[in-house]
């Protein structure tokens, strides 16, 4: 039985996992802690938290792992598959993975965080492997449409001219008093609103395939200040993003 270990230390989750020929053996993750009212962490603080989290998560992963079966360790070494792509938080995972690979005497496989997202989306959809397809990566630091070719090379097609979708969500959420990162909480609020009752609308701004959330965020902040119910604004935000992404993909 062959097994592979994976490590990812991104903004804002520490993740370690192991898979074998039968599937997922272990999948452990911890969200980084951000103080109430703040909209993120400095890279140095994120790096420190990742190191502390790995100290706990890695031994827990090895409890379920047959060490002798490990054939490689894969790590997200950078945000995107570009030579100039760099973010300090990924150094925590890279150092941890390199140490594990050296100790186990197996290869270290370096990938990018974005490639990991794409491959995770293909889990259960392997029929897409080996053929070109359109992909979209949406997070706090990325809002991109790209083409993935037969060799799994990623070519950027479009993105955002200002805020990323995740930043849009987090800024609205923090203004509502939610804890960063706000995605799950804002999504829950949106689920409480009944669109059949009407509600406010936020514009979906896309120019030449490139989106913009800066002006939309300003409008959403004004709605919060005006006392519009948070669930209604949350629904409007997700409706806006859905229409925005649709325009980007159809461009």
Regions found by a protein language model. Name each.
Residues 57-61, 236-251:
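Phosphate/ATP-binding catalytic cores across multiple sugar-kinase/actin-like superfamilies
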Residues 1, 106, 110-134:
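Conserved phosphate-binding catalytic cores of ATP/NTP-utilizing and phosphoryl-transfer enzymes
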Residues 6-7, 75, 108-113:
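General beta-strand structural signal in soluble alpha/beta enzymes
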Residues 10-48, 153-156:
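Short glycine-rich, Thr/Ser-proximal phosphate-binding strand/loop in the N-terminal lobe
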Residues 59-98, 102:
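Short beta-strand-loop/turn "lid" adjacent to the catalytic site in phosphate-handling enzymes
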Residues 94-117, 160-162:
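Short, acidic/small-residue loops that bind anionic groups at enzyme active sites
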Residues 40-42, 46-67:
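Conserved phosphate-binding loops in N-terminal lobes of ATP-dependent enzymes
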Residues 2, 9-10, 27, 129-131, ...:
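A short helix-loop
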């Amino acid at each position: 039985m062959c097994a592979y270990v994976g490590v990812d230390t991104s903004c804002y989750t520490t993740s370690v996992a192991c898979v074998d020929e039968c599937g997922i053996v272990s999948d452990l993750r911890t969200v980084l802690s951000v103080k109430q009212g703040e909209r993120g962490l400095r890279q140095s603080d994120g790096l420190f938290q990742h190191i502390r989290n790995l100290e706990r998560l890695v031994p827990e992963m090895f409890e379920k792992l047959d060490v002798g079966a490990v054939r490689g360790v894969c790590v997200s070494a950078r945000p995107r598959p570009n030579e100039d792509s760099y973010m300090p938080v990924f150094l925590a995972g890279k150092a941890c993975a390199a140490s594990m690979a050296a100790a186990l005497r197996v290869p270290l496989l370096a990938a990018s965080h974005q490639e990991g997202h794409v491959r995770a989306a293909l889990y259960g959809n392997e029929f897409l492997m080996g053929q070109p397809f359109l992909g979209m990566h949406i997070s706090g630091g990325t809002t991109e449409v790209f083409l993935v070719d037969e060799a799994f090379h990623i070519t950027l097609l479009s993105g955002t001219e200002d805020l990323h979708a995740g930043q849009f969500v987090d800024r609205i959420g923090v203004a509502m008093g939610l804890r960063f990162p706000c995605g799950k909480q804002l999504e829950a609020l949106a689920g409480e609103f009944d669109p059949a009752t009407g509600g406010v609308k936020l514009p979906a701004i896309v120019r030449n395939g490139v989106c913009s959330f800066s002006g939309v965020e300003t409008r959403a902040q004004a709605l919060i200040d005006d006392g519009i119910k948070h669930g209604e604004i949350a629904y409007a935000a997700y409706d806006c993003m859905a229409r925005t992404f649709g325009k980007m993909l159809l461009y």
